Design a protein with these regions (language model features):
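Rossmann-fold NAD(P)-binding glycine/threonine-rich loop
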Residues: 627, 643, 777-859
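Catalytic alpha/beta core domains of metabolic enzymes, predominantly
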Residues: 402-541
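NTP-dependent small-molecule kinase module
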Residues: 2-72, 76-90, 111, 115, ...
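Conserved substrate/cofactor phosphate-moiety recognition/catalytic segment
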Residues: 110-156
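Catalytic beta/alpha-barrel core
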Residues: 309-311, 331-342, 369-378, 386, ...
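Conserved phosphate-donor/acceptor-positioning beta-strand/loop module used by diverse small-molecule
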Residues: 183-205, 231
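Glycine-rich phosphate-binding loop used to anchor ATP phosphates in small-molecule kinases
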Residues: 145-187, 194, 566
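Phosphate/diphosphate ligand-binding glycine-rich loop within oxidoreductases
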Residues: 540-676, 808, 816
Length: 888
């Protein structure tokens, strides 16, 4: 029902955060909000729970922080009074973005509403439509009490009428508003949006930075009392070096300056959508799912994975290059240190943690582990830090098993989609691995609901490295539900057991390897990987790129550099061959690890395979061969973690598995190149130029992005018709293996038969163009030198054009798009595509995450255009630096 005069929705088209609400008047006395309300952030973080005091009563106390002399065998603390585990948010639950003005809430709301097909609503705009005045003007006319009452009424109506399918922006802080938001937290995500002081200061036009800092701290403390999640909106600043050098180099190439604001918004878009994907049920954000092979395998299900451990203090001091952390790592563990002696988690410290989490998420794609070091007997402070960590929605969060059952159950009940690692590192005099102490803690972690158990023993002798297998054998032999076990010895003498640990071994960044403390990781990811080969657990393998003419391929340089960076002693070399007949010996070699397949064999190579992925089947082409050495009991090829956990070991090849990663690379390029204004909608249109194997991969990539309108141009119309018929048939039979549920909109295709033919009236102009025709002479066939009709580049919001070749980067259609870059057109070429599809191949060949930044850099470093002698990296470096978007 409509109340308080709310007649209609307050949609995103008019959303602009009003500057005329006096922020200072809304926080007349910021100091009174210093204390964080325990109802949200303390033991009663769920609004439905009663507030529990932080006392040293038996229920909360850890009488001693050292380990007990005997194993923990006491029965669990009675928990009848504890609430049930907080259920996941409904997929259609509306999301509130709350926070101080200038934090970027409106921009984030529009980004999310477009991606999730939701309404974007703004409380201030709603207030103006109801009252005819801004909040500030209304307060001056009617007084603060009446203004606050009307604000509360407006927000109540918005929440009641839009409990589903909306993004709601709120900057108000009145007590009635807080109460409404706190109640909404019971069943909905209410996200506190934070930003750095300078951005807030500029937006609110506050001259005194200290005053702005005080205002931000006070408002943050207040908003944390009525929100259940937190997101730090990292401010991007343009690098002057990139701006000037990119402009100079692009101008020399006849192009335009890269659009820095576009790049900034793209990174914010990926960061925020990634965050929402972690708090909402899977499928809530259409077509955001990763296409990369390892993304579908939980990290804890893979073998020999590494979590690179970095302290919060080193990150705050800018001692580490965040992007370099990914090389060889499967997760990043943020170790929240320096809390011994603290009496509370203050607002500034909470914001620092949120900023670091945001910065890492914005620059990397691997999951985060949030680990707080439990100080001596300061469990209340520890709980504050843990509950704050849960607000940031890390993929993993550790809990110290020295806490009592009530505390552990409370944390686990609040985890939502985060996975909890029960962690224990006892004192140096801990019992041997054969002692029941360790198994009792594993059982306790499992019984209380932890998702993993991590037990780390300070090493006392070399024998400890072998004794840890006793615990692993006991766990393996145990009955009932099992959780993954992380168990090894710490310290330099414990490195052997750490290297042999299967799941999320903590490792140290390369620059810090020489300064390890006894209680810290003493292995790097590279050292741990090398240990697996030096101990003959893994074998050096052979990889190839096959094709008719692959001597110019950049794949060997790219993959060789990646293998070396990860400590993997495999080889990767090109093999040019006129036919597939000569490849039998290579692919049947016991040391064969996989191959990239080039032209003209992407279809013919299917005859060598025993099984194809569902994507390769849909496309009808293969660009990746993977040997299978272990089959399922029924003789089929495994498609889960078993396919990856058997990598890097020599043996008879029992089957060949065919995959297509070209579509993954094209999809990644399109997602990187599409501005938020051109985000895929039901009316979006894509154009495919060509009808060969790569054109099929490009078409498939657009379908995986949710594109429902696809136009095809090919010189030979019959081939275009054949391709359209193929995908139309798959679509109508619902045989397309889409990563996301398809929208209830029929996919339409249109074939343009000649370049003189006008653009079809019932199709919008394309915002995605993929050119799949050759860019250079092939034998006696000259390069086509294809020029597109200028109308094809007429989209008022620009778009993304991808040229798949890289032998030349100066094709006519690329130059056409560069000439209109000022209208929003972004160009990409084979130097963008090759690494993107190569990341997926690297995962398939090795079972490890690809070092993406390094592989991109190596492609640019190795590239040498025909007939030109220049330092490639110097001119391509700005392009590399401007790549800010990564596929998860």
């Amino acid at each position: 029902m409509a109340t308080a005069g709310v007649k209609r929705s307050f949609v995103a088209s008019s959303m602009n955060e009003s500057d005329d609400v006096d922020q200072h008047h809304q926080l007349e006395n910021p100091t009174k909000f210093v204390r964080v309300d325990a109802r949200i952030n303390g033991y009663s973080a769920s609004p439905s729970q009663p507030q529990s005091p932080r006392t040293n009563s038996s229920r909360y106390s850890m009488a001693a922080c050292s380990r007990p002399e005997t194993p923990v065998t006491r029965p669990a603390t009675p928990i009848a009074h504890l609430p049930n585990e907080i259920p996941p948010f409904p997929a259609d639950a509306s999301i509130v973005l709350a926070g101080i003005r200038g934090a970027g809430k409106s921009t984030l709301a529009i980004i999310a509403s477009t991606a999730m097909a939701r309404r974007a609503l703004d409380c201030e705009k709603a207030f103006q439509q109801v009252t005819g005045l801004t909040s500030f003007a209304y307060k001056r006319a009617h007084g603060p009490v009446e203004c606050h009452r009307r604000q509360t009424d407006v927000l109540r109506d918005l929440l009641e009428q839009n409990s589903k399918g909306a993004l709601i922006v709120c900057s108000w802080m009145e007590r009635g508003v807080q109460t409404l938001l706190r109640d909404f937290c019971r069943t909905h995500p209410v996200v506190h949006i934070l930003r750095d002081v300078r951005a807030i200061q500029d937006h609110l036009k506050i001259e005194d930075e200290e005053k702005a800092r005080s205002l931000l701290a006070a408002s943050s403390t207040l908003f944390r009392t009525c929100t259940n999640l937190e997101f730090f909106n990292v401010t991007e600043t343009a690098d002057p070096w990139i701006e000037t050098d990119a402009a100079r180099i692009e101008t020399q190439a006849g192009g335009q300056k890269p659009p820095a604001p576009y790049l900034t918004l793209k990174r914010a878009e990926r960061h925020f959508l990634k965050f929402l994907s972690l708090i909402m049920p899977k499928g809530s954000i259409p077509f955001i799912e990763s296409a990369f092979p390892l993304a579908s395998i939980p990290t804890e299900d893979r073998r020999f994975t590494y979590a690179i451990s970095v302290s919060l203090s080193s990150l705050l001091n800018n001692e580490i290059d965040i992007e370099e952390l990914e090389t060889g790592a499967d997760a990043i563990e943020i170790v929240v240190d320096g809390i011994t002696g603290a009496t509370t988690l203050d607002s500034e410290r909470a914001a620092e943690i949120a900023r670091i989490v945001g910065s890492i998420r914005r620059s990397t794609v691997i999951p985060l582990i949030y680990h707080v070091v439990l100080p001596d007997c300061s469990e209340s402070v520890y709980m504050d830090f843990i509950m704050h960590g849960l607000r940031l929605s890390p993929e993993y969060l550790t809990v110290d098993l020295r806490l009592n059952d009530y505390q552990l159950l409370h944390i686990i009940s609040m985890k939502r989609r985060s996975k909890v690692i029960g962690h224990l590192t006892p004192a140096a005099d801990s019992p041997s691995w054969a002692d029941p102490f360790w198994m009792s803690h594993y059982h306790r972690a499992r019984r209380l609901g932890c998702d993993l158990a991590r037990l780390i023993k300070p090493v006392t002798c070399i024998k400890d490295n072998f004794d840890v297998n006793h615990l692993k054998a006991l766990v393996e032999a145990s009955t009932g539900h099992k959780i993954p076990l992380i168990a090894y010895n710490s310290g330099p003498r414990g490195r052997h057991s750490a290297a042999m640990n299967h799941v999320l071994t903590s490792v140290v960044p390369e620059p810090m390897a020489s300064n390890c403390k006894p209680d810290q990781p003493c292995l790097t990811a590279v050292q741990a990987t090398q240990a697996l080969y030096n101990s003959f657990l893994f074998d050096p393998m052979k990889m190839y790129v096959f094709g008719a003419h692959v001597s110019y391929s950049l794949s060997p340089a790219m993959h060789t550099a990646a293998l070396k960076a990860c400590g993997i002693p495999h080889s990767y070399r090109p093999v040019s061959t006129p036919s597939l007949n000569g490849l039998r010996e290579l692919i049947e070699d016991p040391y064969f690890a996989g191959a990239s397949v080039g032209l003209p064999f992407k279809v013919e190579v299917i005859t060598l395979t025993h099984s194809l992925s569902r994507h390769a089947q849909a496309i009808g082409a293969v660009n990746t061969l993977v040997p299978v050495r272990r089959l399922n009991p029924d003789g089929t090829i495994p498609e889960d973690e078993k396919l990856f956990n058997c990598r890097n070991r020599a043996g008879p090849v029992r089957a060949l598995y065919g995959e297509n990663t070209d579509w993954i690379g094209i999809r990644a390029c399109l997602r990187r190149g599409l501005s938020p204004a051109n985000a895929v909608r039901p009316t979006s249109c894509g154009l495919i130029i060509g009808a060969g194997g790569m054109a099929r991969a490009a078409t498939y990539s657009m379908l995986q992005l949710g594109v429902k309108n696809i136009v095809v141009y090919n010189r030979t119309v019959a081939n275009a018709e054949k391709m359209v018929t193929h995908f139309t048939r798959l679509s109508k039979r619902h045989d397309l293996p889409l990563l996301s549920a398809a929208l209830d909109v029929e996919t339409r295709f249109h074939i343009i038969r000649t370049l003189d033919e006008p653009w079809p009236e019932d199709f919008r102009l394309p915002t995605m163009i993929v050119s799949c025709i050759p860019t250079h002479r092939i034998g006696d066939v000259p390069a086509p030198n294809f020029f597109a009709p200028s109308s094809w580049l007429g989209s008022p919001t620009g778009g993304c054009l991808v040229e798949l070749g890289y032998k030349t980067l100066d094709t006519p259609i690329l130059n056409q798009a560069r000439q209109v870059s000022n209208r929003g057109w972004v160009t990409m070429d084979g130097l963008d595509l090759l690494p993107e599809q190569g990341f997926a191949q690297f995962e398939l060949f090795t079972g490890r995450r690809a070092p993406r930044r390094l592989m991109r850099g190596e492609v640019f470093r190795a590239y040498q255009p025909d007939g030109q002698d220049r330092a490639a990296l110097a001119q391509l470096q700005p392009r590399l630096n401007n790549i800010v978007e990564q596929e998860p």
